[in-house]
């Protein structure tokens, strides 16, 4: 019997109907590799192996051993490459699509890593519902929604109740999808002077992420007040106010009311 480790945020999805819904929600992958974070009890992994070759990152050595035993007992049409490694250090050389039931405590960081990685072309993940809603809202309500929609499109697919897991978490989960868009990536990469596209895209993402942290540091305060506290951006406050005037927005706007953060950042970086 496998006991979930609280230290790793383990809640294993066991409900067959939701496992099937996740697999069926995958978009066409060819020619992308499919990468999974977390093997869990192997239920999702085994279903994926009925349709696709798969590479899975798993930090828990006990779960890796259980998965190897299951694969010896169950022959699957496609092969699994099981990597016993922390997914925070995931690095792929070829384009891939990411799928995972992400641990709650580290889900946001793993999604942001995937968004920043030029090799990741999209993702289908399950997180705490509150986190999924932050990523998928269509306006600028928070920094996560701005980041994800600057590089692609995020869609909330369905909710998963606590009863679908073992052990059951205290909150609902949600499955959402992100598909990256090359034109948006090109615009983000153009923020930097880095000559190579993939490096420029990563640098552009990091620059925007850093800027948004300053803008949303105190969401209830005005954008101006937040930037006054930022060592990196306080000297650019006058340019921010100029931009707001050009966009016919009041200087008292909150961060959630800014219409186009990429355009604003481009304006600030001009000189």
Swiss-Prot record:
Main location: cytoplasm
One of the record's GO molecular function terms: 16S rRNA (adenine(1518)-N(6)/adenine(1519)-N(6))-dimethyltransferase activity
Domain of life assignment: Bacteria
Enzyme's top EC category: transferase
Binding-site list for S-adenosyl-L-methionine: 11, 13, 38, 58, 86, 101
Annotated compartments: Cytoplasm
Function per UniProt: Specifically dimethylates two adjacent adenosines (A1518 and A1519) in the loop of a conserved hairpin near the 3'-end of 16S rRNA in the 30S particle. May play a critical role in biogenesis of 30S subunits.
Gene3D superfamilies: Ribosomal RNA adenine dimethylase-like, domain 2 (1.10.8.100), Vaccinia Virus protein VP39 (3.40.50.150)
Name of this chain's protein: Ribosomal RNA small subunit methyltransferase A
Listed Pfam families: RrnaAD
UniProt keyword annotation of Membrane present: no
Similarity section: Belongs to the class I-like SAM-binding methyltransferase superfamily. rRNA adenine N(6)-methyltransferase family. RsmA subfamily.
Lineage: Bacteria, Pseudomonadati, Campylobacterota, Epsilonproteobacteria, Campylobacterales
InterPro entries referenced in this protein's UniProt entry, alphabetically: KsgA/Erm (IPR001737), rRNA_Ade_diMease-like_C (IPR023165), rRNA_Ade_Mease_Trfase_CS (IPR020596), rRNA_Ade_methylase_Trfase_N (IPR020598), rRNA_adenine_dimethylase (IPR011530), SAM-dependent_MTases_sf (IPR029063)
EC number, as in UniProt: 2.1.1.182
Catalytic reaction annotation: adenosine(1518)/adenosine(1519) in 16S rRNA + 4 S-adenosyl-L-methionine = N(6)-dimethyladenosine(1518)/N(6)-dimethyladenosine(1519) in 16S rRNA + 4 S-adenosyl-L-homocysteine + 4 H(+)
CDD domains documented for this protein: AdoMet_MTases
Cellular component terms per the entry's GO annotation: cytosol
This protein's UniProt keywords: Cytoplasm, Methyltransferase, RNA-binding, rRNA processing, S-adenosyl-L-methionine, Transferase
């Amino acid at each position: 019997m496998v006991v979930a480790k609280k230290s790793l945020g383990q809640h294993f999805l066991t409900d067959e109907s939701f496992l099937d819904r996740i697999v069926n929600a995958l978009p066409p992958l060819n020619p992308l590799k499919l990468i999974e974070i977390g093997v869990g009890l192997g239920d999702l992994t085994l279903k994926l192996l009925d349709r696709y070759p798969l590479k899975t990152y798993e930090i828990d050595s006990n779960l890796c051993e259980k998965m190897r035993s299951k694969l010896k007992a169950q022959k699957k049409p496609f092969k699994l490459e099981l990597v016993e490694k922390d997914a925070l250090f995931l690095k792929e050389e070829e384009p891939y699509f990411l799928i995972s039931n992400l641990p709650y405590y580290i889900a946001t960081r793993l999604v942001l890593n995937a968004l920043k990685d030029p090799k990741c072309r999209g993702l289908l993940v399950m997180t705490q519902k509150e986190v999924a809603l932050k990523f998928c809202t269509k306006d600028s309500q928070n920094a996560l929604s701005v980041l994800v929609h600057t590089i692609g499109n995020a869609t909330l697919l369905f909710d998963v109740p606590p009863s679908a897991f073992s052990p059951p978490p205290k909150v609902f989960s949600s499955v959402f999808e992100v598909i990256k868009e090359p034109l948006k990536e090109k615009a983000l990469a153009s923020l930097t002077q880095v000559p190579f596209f993939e490096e420029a895209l990563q640098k552009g993402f990091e620059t925007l992420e850093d800027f948004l942290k300053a803008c949303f540091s105190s969401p209830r305060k005005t954008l101006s007040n937040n930037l006054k506290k930022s060592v990196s951006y306080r000297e650019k406050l006058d340019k921010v106010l100029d931009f707001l005037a050009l966009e016919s927005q009041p200087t008292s706007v909150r961060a959630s009311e800014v219409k186009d953060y990429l355009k604003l950042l481009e304006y600030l970086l001009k000189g």
